[in-house]
From Swiss-Prot:
Protein name, per record: DNA-directed RNA polymerase subunit beta
Alphabetized InterPro entries for the sequence: DNA-dir_RNA_pol_bsu_ext_1_sf, DNA-dir_RNA_pol_bsu_external_1, DNA-dir_RNA_pol_su2, DNA-dir_RNAP_su2_dom, DNA-dir_RNAP_su2_hyb_sf, RNA_pol_bsu_bac, RNA_pol_bsu_CS, RNA_pol_bsu_protrusion
Function as written in the Swiss-Prot or TrEMBL entry: DNA-dependent RNA polymerase catalyzes the transcription of DNA into RNA using the four ribonucleoside triphosphates as substrates.
Biased composition (Acidic residues): 1088-1115
Species of the source: Desulfitobacterium hafniense (strain Y51)
Cellular component aspect of the GO annotation: DNA-directed RNA polymerase complex
Length: 1115
């Protein structure tokens, strides 16, 4: 039934029936291999393409010979700390040849710092960890289409798409004429282009295409007689208005399609063309040839005669991946070509005798191109670091968006839909919900990328009905030709199929065939899904929509204080944690010399020592806590590749995103209405779902026009009680507990000089500068935040730290919070069963089992049937049995425990086979009427925490334009009282409430100050004034040339004043600065949907770290 399997240091009992024939590849090799290719091959290709650069006379020649990468200046951790880029200097060996004198100069030229990939497959850019997402684009090649004209006639098209260069399109009309469009211009008869290629006479053309009737029809429309006329005709279409000559026409056509500098099919385009058109053009010819054009037209004629078939552009054989290496190469190419222009110009301007390669080469465009790519490309994303699975998935993400890809608005249904060629290549489940659905996917578990950028899936070869252990990787095109059996087809011991008819896939169809007809067999049942999906047990019993939510929500699980691997797993947990890079691995066999919370020292068998420093309480990109702890003891033997320290969300080397909790499916007093969750106080007390969150705050002392700012403990008008936790520098001490409004870094800024009286000037003269006016601009804990100070970092110019221009000192303070689970937090299981905590109840009031154990979570049974995610019920049953047996189980996707296995395991554990039991009401002790399903389910706490969302405003900033309060937590905004809310007040005649909401609480600038004054002084609240929006309305009408005036009831004109003097005075007295809105100046009005940083950004890691560039870096 089930058997033990060793995963890391732990045993899991697996229900799998299918032997694994192929180990899963390293899960982040898609990133690493691509970047390695770039360093080894990609750069070399770029320099080879651009070299040699000649000046316009051909006298000076600049050649790039070789390049090398130096050592990075700082280690990865130090780069994060100092906010610098993890990069190594790129040096290029350049040779300058003067052909007149024969003089040769060689020099090594520095070409800027090149960002390096870390061992985890990420980049550190300006101290932030980023990931370059792979892009799915249309492959270069030739594509055929057919559609039906409104008249009912079939019309055909063919398009030759290069990697870069002009498109060549053939199309037919209703009368079977064939036309050609060159580079999206007006169409010409196709024979004109063929004639221009050198097939001058009608006879030659007819012979070339075996006297095809469509060609004959087209020739009748063609009014050119010779190759020269044809060239001129094409030139007229491409360059209307310029006088055509045969020579200029010939060189234009040459440049468009036959010049390697202007037209590039790339290696993959040549491969696709040769394969599609059965050509044997050499693979290093990356431009079009005459044969290509003729063959592509010939193929289209075949299609018109009813043979062959049109291409499906959503097929993965026609879409390829651009990974990091290629994206970088394209960016580098842009930089180099800009540099090439500069070099050419400098060759002509400068004196030939004193010229050196160093003088010619300007590296700025190259550096700027790379910087721009990493800093602001759509595909360079701020890494989602919520937990290890989120990191791993982000690195394996495939996006159809980005430069050269699709846009959300233009992408239709077909592009987003699941396609049969996705099988084993791209996960059909894991994709975001929302506008990006189907445009962003995830690489399947066993998928790999071939040198052409196509995704390959592995299959076992089948010979005459016998399955071998030979593994072939097939691209989507190759797979179309074969019949592929499922991984779970029953086999005999020697690998023959048992059944007489086998289920198989052939292209888009499912077939039932004899064993001899089978060509290949799947290597594993989980090869069609991604990592996140493969972590869902009983996936086969869940509806796809809920599985999608389950896969996405696992990536939002917060790392908990105490981790606990699931009782019911899928066997993928170990591999996912190991490859995510958050754990520490032993590099060689050896013995542990020392294992402390700080570091682990291992003595290898060859006698060398290796020290692994552990990461302690660092802040992740998402503010969760990164902490590593050793799981080996002193003198323990370790093997190469063994996990020796756990990272966040891992438990003994296994991914552990949540906790195993005892749940019951029952309603309870309406507290689990609409997916709400009722939990026991035990989960709070025993820190089941407590997580650590670390926030970073920074203060910098700059040079201002009035003098430098100063970080100091000496702050004006602040009592000693406020300064108690600051050290002598004015920076908070580590370990201090702080809450809203406390000073973290004391800082003063010089105020503008005021007119001094004679006495003050005398004091100044005697006591020097001391009496200068400064104002308090200290860094304080923001509204709603609190915690303990865990780290303080100080960077100064004197210590040689690299700081932004104008900054003299930078202080970073890290505040950690322990967040217990609370009402309003979002929780979820792995099956898309999500909900919000509605009540935390005393342990003694929870329903309890016959043996007295109180239930920990109560879920609504109505959440199951309509959602069709029965996997959660199966997991609950099996979890109960696992707990009773004291085992951890693995039920791999599509190859896990069957219903009978679950019942058998429950029996073995001595539990009722139904998985149900009598529960008793904790308040009365009475049994509930019916038996209730109870058991252990793995439940996660998600990164949508109520502490981050709850928000209240008293007095805050107003928008400069409308003078109304801003919106959203990030802006410390107010709650919008909208149209419908106004109706509600109108309906009940609440006139005064309505009046103050529309005036003093909103945009009546004068009234707000007077009201504040009245409240402070304890007087009655005065009449409100005119709201700003009313003034704006009048101004708008006046700007349309309408004479609008405001009259009172007795027809007297009312003067609408601007903010008057006494208001400004009052404001000053009350300490309200009207011009610098409280508490922070207004930056902008947030657009709709972006009103704060917490709108559900379930997908695509948000780029919340804007990049800064110096102007001179950009060209």
């Amino acid at each position: 039934m089930f058997y033990p399997v060793k995963v890391g240091t732990r045993e899991r009992w697996s229900y799998s029936r299918i032997r694994e024939v192929l180990d899963m590849p390293n899960l982040i090799e898609i990133q690493q291999n691509s970047y390695q290719w770039f360093l080894d091959e990609g750069l070399r290709e770029m320099f080879r393409d651009i070299s040699p650069i000649q000046d316009f006379t051909g006298n000076l020649v600049l050649e790039f010979i070789d390049y090398s990468l130096g050592e990075p200046k700082y280690e990865v951790e130090e780069c994060k700390e100092r906010d610098v880029t993890y990069a190594a200097p790129l040096r290029v060996k350049v040779r300058l040849i003067n052909k007149e004198t024969g003089e040769v100069k060689e020099q090594e030229v520095f070409m800027g710092d090149f960002p390096l990939m870390t061992t985890k497959g990420t980049f550190i850019i300006n101290g932030a960890e980023r990931v370059i997402v792979s892009q799915l684009v249309r492959s270069p090649g030739v594509y055929y289409s057919e559609s039906i004209d409104p008249s009912g006639k079939k019309v055909f098209g063919a398009t030759v798409i290069p990697n870069r260069g002009a498109w060549l399109e053939f199309e037919t009309d209703v009368n079977d004429n064939i036309f050609v469009r060159v580079d999206r211009t007006r169409k010409l008869p196709a024979t004109v282009l063929i004639r221009a290629l050198g097939y001058a006479t009608n006879g030659q053309i007819a012979e070339l295409f075996d006297d095809n009737e469509h060609i004959r029809i087209t020739l009748e429309r063609d009014n050119t007689e010779s190759a020269e006329e044809a060239l001129v005709e094409i030139y007229k279409r491409l360059r209307p208005g310029e006088p055509p000559t045969v020579d200029s026409a010939r060189s234009l056509l040459e440049a468009l399609f036959f010049d390697p500098k202007r037209y590039d099919l790339a290696k993959v385009g040549r491969y696709k063309l040769n394969k599609k058109l059965n050509l044997s053009v050499p693979t290093d010819v990356h431009h079009l040839t005459k044969e290509d054009i003729v063959a592509s037209l010939r193929q289209m004629l075949t299609l018109m005669s009813g043979e062959g078939h049109k291409d499906d552009i959503d097929h993965l054989g026609n879409r390829r991946l651009r990974s990091v290496g290629e994206l970088l190469q394209n960016q580098f190419r842009i930089g180099l070509s800009r540099m090439e222009r500069v070099v050419r110009e400098r060759m002509t301007i400068q004196d030939v005798d004193v010229i050196t390669p160093q003088v010619l080469i300007n590296i700025r465009p190259v550096v700027a191109a790379i910087k721009e790519f990493f800093g602001s490309s759509q595909l360079s994303q701020f890494m989602d670091q919520t937990n290890p699975l989120a990191e791993l998935t982000h690195k394996r993400r495939l996006s159809a968006l980005g430069p050269g890809g699709l846009s959300r608005e233009r992408a239709g249904f077909e592009v987003r839909d699941v396609h049969h060629s996705h099988y084993g290549r791209m996960c059909p489940i894991e994709t975001p919900e929302g506008p990006n659905i189907g445009l962003i996917g995830s690489l399947s578990t066993y998928g790999r990328i071939n040198p052409y950028g196509f995704i390959e899936a592995p299959y076992r070869k089948v010979n005459n009905g016998q399955v071998t252990d030979q593994i072939d990787y097939l691209t989507a095109d190759e797979e179309e030709k074969f019949v592929v059996a499922q991984a779970n087809a029953p086999l005999t011991d020697d690998g023959h199929f048992i059944e007489e008819k086998i289920d198989g896939r052939h292209g888009p169809d499912f077939v039932l065939v004899a064993p001899e007809r089978i060509d290949y067999m799947d290597v594993s049942p989980k090869q069609m899904v991604s990592i996140a999906t493969a972590l869902i047990p009983f996936l086969e019993h869940d509806d796809a929509n809920r599985a999608l939510m389950g896969a996405n929500m696992q990536r939002q699980a917060v790392p908990l204080l105490r981790t606990d691997a699931p009782y019911v797993g899928t066997g993928m947990e170990y591999k996912a944690a190991k490859d995510s890079g958050v754990c520490v691995l032993a590099s060689k066999d050896g013995t542990v010399e020392r294992a402390t919370a700080e570091d682990i020292i291992i003595r290898h068998d060859d006698g060398t020592l290796e020290k692994h420093k552990l990461l302690k309480y660092l802040r992740s990109n998402q503010g969760t806590c990164i902490n590593q702890r050793p799981i080996v003891m002193k003198n323990e033997r370790v093997e190469a590749g063994q996990i020796i320290a756990d990272g966040p969300s891992t438990d003994h080397g296994e991914l552990a995103l949540g906790r195993n909790v005892l749940i019951a499916f029952m309603t309870w007093e309406g507290y689990n209405y609409e997916d709400a969750i009722l939990i026991s106080e035990k989960l709070v007390k025993e820190d089941y779902y407590t997580s650590i969150h670390i926030e970073e705050y920074e203060a910098d002392a700059r040079d201002t026009k009035l003098g430098p700012e100063e970080i100091t403990r000496d702050i004006p008008n602040v009592g000693e009680d406020v300064l108690k936790d600051l050290d002598e520098r004015g920076i908070i001490r580590i370990g201090a507990e702080v809450s809203t409004g406390d000073i973290l870094v004391g800082k003063v800024t010089p105020k503008g000089e005021t007119e001094l009286t004679a006495e003050e000037r005398l004091l100044r003269a005697i006591f020097g500068e001391k009496a200068r006016e400064v104002r308090d601009t200290s860094l304080r804990v923001p509204h709603g935040e609190a915690g303990k100070i865990v780290d303080v970092k100080v960077f100064t110019r004197e210590n040689g730290d690299e700081l932004a221009p104008g900054v003299n000192e930078l202080v970073r303070v890290y505040i950690a919070q322990k967040r217990k689970i609370s009402v309003g937090d979002k929780m979820a299981g792995r099956h898309g069963n999500k909900g919000v905590i509605s009540r935390i109840m005393k342990q003694e009031d929870m329903p309890f089992l016959p043996d007295g154990t109180p239930v920990e979570i109560v879920l609504n049974p109505l959440g199951v049937p309509s959602r069709m995610n029965i996997g959660q019920v199966m997991e609950t049953h099996l979890g109960w049995a696992a707990k009773a047996l004291g085992l951890r189980l693995a039920t791999p996707v599509f190859d896990g425990a069957q219903e009978e296995d679950v019942f058998a395991t429950l029996r073995k554990a001595g539990l009722p086979e139904t998985g149900k039991t009598v529960l008793y009401d904790g308040r009365t002790g009475d049994p509930f009427d019916n038996k209730i399903t109870v058991g252990y389910m793995y439940f996660l706490k998600l990164h949508h925490l109520v502490d981050d969302k709850i928000h209240a405003r008293s007095t805050g900033p107003y928008s400069l334009v409308t003078q109304q309060p801003l919106g959203g937590k990030a802006q410390f905004g107010g709650q919008r009282f909208g149209e419908m809310e106004v109706w509600a007040l109108e309906a009940y005649g609440a006139a005064y409430t309505l009046q103050e909401i529309l005036t003093v609480k909103s945009d009546d600038v004068v009234g707000r100050v007077k009201t504040y004054e009245a409240i402070v002084k304890g007087e009655n609240i005065p009449e409100p004034g005119v709201p700003e929006s009313f003034k704006v309305l009048i101004k708008e009408l006046q700007s349309l040339g309408l004479d609008v005036r405001v009259l009172s009831e007795n027809d007297e004109e009312i003067e609408i004043r601007e903010i008057d003097e006494d208001v400004t005075e009052t404001a000053k007295e009350l300490g309200i600065d009207l011009h610098e809105d409280l508490p922070a100046p207004v930056i902008h009005e947030a657009g709709e949907g972006e009103d704060d940083e917490y709108f559900e950004e379930d997908e695509e890691a948000v780029d919340d770290e804007p990049m800064t560039f110096d102007d001179d870096d950009m060209e």
